[in-house]
Amino acid sequence: MYIRFKIGRQIYQQRLASAILFGLLALSTVLASWLKSSGFHADYVYQLELAVGGDTHLHSLLAFLLTLALYRVLSVTESGYNMVLVAGGLVTLCCLVDEGLQAFSPLRTFSVQDILASLIGVAVACAVNTLLAGRRQRKRRNT
């Protein structure tokens, strides 16, 4: 129990802005998905999709940003390659759950293309995070 409080305190003290950014990104992603599924003010989501180039581009962009932000939050505890995999795995799981739930919504359709777009966003973010983690480890070794 003490470990959880210690990690929470570390995130609060060292990565508060990153945690807020991740929370806002996650909340806006869930809200956009819910708005499209319910049909309630879905035109705002469609306008956002058009602004970024389409539905698949939005999937890639959000998965990319969520993975980067989550790694930034989680790297306060350990900045190695394991956290890259944890962040990528959690975002991938959430993307799969969201796309799977669309199969049960009458206003939405399940799309493998959307899953692949999300996986591409996660993979690119994991590559960036891996480069950053490697750079941090080399910097620590040299000091």
Residue ranges and their predicted role:
Residues 1-73:
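"…centered on the first transmembrane helix and the immediately adjacent amphipathic helix/loop
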Residues 3-4, 137-143:
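Short, charged juxtamembrane terminal tails flanking transmembrane helices
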Residues 9-19, 83-86, 130, 134:
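Lipid interaction determinants
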Residues 22-33, 84-103, 119:
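Small-polar-interrupted transmembrane alpha-helices in polytopic inner-membrane proteins
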Residues 40-46, 95-123:
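Interfacial helix-loop-helix junctions of multi-pass membrane proteins
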Residues 52-57, 80, 84, 107, ...:
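Hydrophobic, aromatic-rich alpha-helical transmembrane segments
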Residues 61-77, 85, 120-136:
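Membrane-interfacial alpha-helical segments at the cytosolic side of multi-pass membrane proteins
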Residues 76-89, 143:
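Internal alpha-helical transmembrane segments of multi-pass membrane proteins
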